[in-house]
Amino acid sequence: MTTVLAIETSCDETAAAVVKNRHIYSNVIASQIAAHRPYGGVVPEVASRQHLENINAVIDEALAVAGLGWAEIDAIAATCAPGLVGSLLIGLTAAKTLALVHQKPFLGIHHLEGHIAASYLAHPDLHPPFLCLLVSGGHTSLIYVKDIGDYETLGQTRDDAAGEAFDKVARLLGLGYPGGPVIDRLASQGNPAAFHLPEGNISLPGGGYHPYDSSFSGLKTAVLRLVEKLKTEGDLPIADLAASFQDCVARSLTRRTIACALDYSLETIAIGGGVAANRGLRSHLQAAAAAHNLRVLFPPLSLCTDNAAMIACAAAAHLERGHTSPLTLGGQSRLAITEVMQLYQ
């Protein structure tokens, strides 16, 4: 049984956690939402400075809550890609320094592999192969999980990620940042059938549409034009707009996910990322999965957004297979999940 201390600083959450045998001993998160809210989104320079201020206290708290000392930690991990490079470097530098000082193995972890691993924490009986729908502010992907470190991307967004679309539409509606939770809350008070909005389909050169790829930029533009039209008419039913937009996104993601699972004969679907907390998406996926005798797994809300417990879980799985990373490993703003094994020696 491997005990891992992990650090997550890929975007705007400073997090540290201790995980052993898919059991969370501590999961500490210092949120930066208040610091970024005045700007309507994440400011990379602000994020880096916040990480620098928070990192030591977050690591200390993770160890204290776990009730463990350095002698009981088997390895130290940190998110190394993809993400904001300045933010990644804070967590990476801390993890590599601790690994060097305490003579522990170091592992760099792909952020998306962490989101996949969140399902292992929530459902310890889960094992590959399965399909994972990753939906967050920066990513929307359908990933065939064949084994630890062995992934195939079957579908992805061609423009905006689903979470990014939520934030942009929230801004159009004057709802503030972050947009996802606000739209979800308002959608429960609105009529999802109030407005017909277009699902984004990706045309194929030979005709037809890509069965698994998504597009949300057109949907965002459709909402913008609808808002402008409604404003000229003097009525802006915010709750109905939120409900219609959310329902469109949820239907689009559900249709592609179910089709992908059926086409590849994958009976289990795991959902990960911040948008996995969305009630509309959960409702659509659960109903569709039940109709096709598929198993759909959602992590608890605490593991949907960025956290270090999921990074620790992914690191433990790699360490148990003999994988470690060199201390020369740097942060990368982009790295396909299919290239995750290049992080190890």
From Swiss-Prot:
Subcellular location field: Cytoplasm
Cofactor(s) needed by this chain: Fe(2+)
Pfam families, per the entry: TsaD (PF00814)
Record's cofactor remark: Binds 1 Fe(2+) ion per subunit.
Single biological process term from Gene Ontology: tRNA threonylcarbamoyladenosine modification
Enzyme's top EC category: transferase
Cellular component terms (Gene Ontology): cytoplasm
Superkingdom in the source lineage: Bacteria
Family to which the UniProt record says this protein belongs: Belongs to the KAE1 / TsaD family.
Function: Required for the formation of a threonylcarbamoyl group on adenosine at position 37 (t(6)A37) in tRNAs that read codons beginning with adenine. Is involved in the transfer of the threonylcarbamoyl moiety of threonylcarbamoyl-AMP (TC-AMP) to the N6 group of A37, together with TsaE and TsaB. TsaD likely plays a direct catalytic role in this reaction.
HAMAP family: TsaD
PANTHER family referenced in this protein's UniProt entry, alphabetically: TRNA N6-ADENOSINE THREONYLCARBAMOYLTRANSFERASE, TRNA N6-ADENOSINE THREONYLCARBAMOYLTRANSFERASE, MITOCHONDRIAL
Protein name, per record: tRNA N6-adenosine threonylcarbamoyltransferase
Organism: Cyanothece sp. (strain PCC 7425 / ATCC 29141)
Taxonomic lineage from the root: Bacteria, Bacillati, Cyanobacteriota, Cyanophyceae, Gomontiellales
Name of the encoding gene: tsaD
